[in-house]
């Protein structure tokens, strides 16, 4: 019985952990039917605030590969040089703190435990994908995903996480039709 209680508590805590949150925003005055090609924007210079563990060529290939797959599936064609759209991405890593308080007094076996407050620190990563009009340099669409991250992921796990984030971001991408101003900012938790 004691082992079953621990397993149930672990499953509850795992289910309450940070999830991948996906958002998008766009300019409804642009008609995506007028665009057929895209290209990558210039590489971002690594600054002191950008963690080189996340800004690297391996993740660059993973993000671009997943975005390429999503955009070509929507009928856009990759074109080196002159194109209708320019795709940029950004990675932001922030330190976060969460405070978890146990309920006031609970019984654990033969012991009565007092309320405890635990402070947990973790890193939160945000992947932002921007799509801009290449002729005006105006932002047309922005999608982003935010989640807790772990620096100790295996390469296979990292690839799966990036693909999942990019796929969920592009689920918010308009389907090549004129968007309506009434829908504006969108959010979905996965």
Regions found by a protein language model. Name each.
Residues 12-15:
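C-terminal motif of bacterial Sec signal peptides marking the signal peptidase cleavage site
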Residues 17-29, 119-127, 133-140, 146-190:
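C-terminal/domain-edge helix-coil "capping" segments
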Residues 25-44:
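Post-signal peptide N-terminal segment of mature Sec-exported envelope proteins
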Residues 67-75, 91, 95, 135, ...:
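Sec/Tat-exported extracytoplasmic proteins
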Residues 85, 89-138:
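Surface-exposed short loop/turn segments
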């Amino acid at each position: 019985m004691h082992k079953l209680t621990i397993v149930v508590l672990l499953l509850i805590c795992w289910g309450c952990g940070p999830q991948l949150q996906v958002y998008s925003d766009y300019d409804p005055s642009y008609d995506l039917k007028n665009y057929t090609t895209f290209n990558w924007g210039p590489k971002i210079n690594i600054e002191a605030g950008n963690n080189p563990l996340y800004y690297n060529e391996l993740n660059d290939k993973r993000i671009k590969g997943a975005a390429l797959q999503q955009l070509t599936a929507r009928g856009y064609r990759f074109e080196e040089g002159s194109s209708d759209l320019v795709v940029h991405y950004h990675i932001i890593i922030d330190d976060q703190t969460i405070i978890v308080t146990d309920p006031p007094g609970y019984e654990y076996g033969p012991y009565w435990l007092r309320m405890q407050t635990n402070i947990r620190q973790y890193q939160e990563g945000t992947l932002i994908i921007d799509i801009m009009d290449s002729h005006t340099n105006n932002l047309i669409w922005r999608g982003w995903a935010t989640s807790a991250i772990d620096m100790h992921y295996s390469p296979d796990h990292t690839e799966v996480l990036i693909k999942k984030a990019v796929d969920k971001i592009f689920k918010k991408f308009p389907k090549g039709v004129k968007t309506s101003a009434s829908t504006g900012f969108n959010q979905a938790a996965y």
